[in-house]
Amino acid sequence: MRESTLIVSLDFELFWGMQDGWELSEYEENILGGRAAIPKMLELFRRHGIHATWAAVGYLFGRNEGELRRYFPTELPGYDDPKLSGYRCFGSIGTDEGSAPCYYGRSLIDLIAAAEGQELGSHTFSHYYCREPGQTTAQFRADLDAARAIAADQGFDLTSIILPRNQCEPEYTPVMREAGFTAYRDEENDWIHEKIHFKPLLRILRLADVYLPLTGQGGYIPKVENGIVNLVGSRMYKPFFKPLGFLEGLKLRRIKKQMLHAAKNGLTFHLWWHPHNVGVRTELHMQQLEEIFSYYDELKEKYGMRSLNMGEAAREILNRG
């Protein structure tokens, strides 16, 4: 039987993933708390042998604004809605990690890179949105080239990519492969995402699925698409939501049942979240993650489940042919 695999990935973006919809003052506590939680997560991963992919926005590789600007593409994303572009923020946010810790994160990049089993991946250079009107595949390619260039000049070879908000269309997968990526994380492949297009209902069903098995078990066999491995996200680890706090036990039970199903059937289960998701109520979230990864230890012992980061999983799959 195939070996079962647990993949963990994190969308490492600081405030760049929120700047188009939030004021920093509204979310700063979460971002700064997420920064403080990263060493705790790395220690948790070390204790349980968890190999994870940290998909970082390219801006985080820069030590300061001057260094970052040298990598700005000549062709920037042409979104119809200009607030979507992070480039508009420069000049008003501070120039380095000391003055703008919600926007710069080079010290965290170095911390992650030094930890065993942790892979640095890409969350695009500018937190690029592939489904927004006005942008083009050529602009997307320019963004990816910038992301790989700033990382390569600092000794990092990025081969795994997670697209912001999981926005991917078929014409973008060959662009990712041509840019040098071998793995990406697509959005959950279930009936909610495929058939429900009315956004209020979609949000309700996605929230309910956190606690109840509306969409099945989430395990799968990864596929190669145009030379790039699609490592679909199985489950986002959702942060504590106070109005439904009494259902937290169901949330953890749901994740563990999905992990068990994957372990028993030789499938891949891909768990993901953002560091800022655990930036408030951090100790509660760390206790929950400890419970999840202690359960992984049991599945490893009983069923031989493995922990691989996205790059490791993709290499294994591509080498098998």
Indicate where each model-derived feature is located.
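Catalytic alpha-helical scaffold of carbohydrate-active enzymes acting on polysaccharides/glycoconjugates
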Residues: 1-160, 165-231, 249-271, 278-321
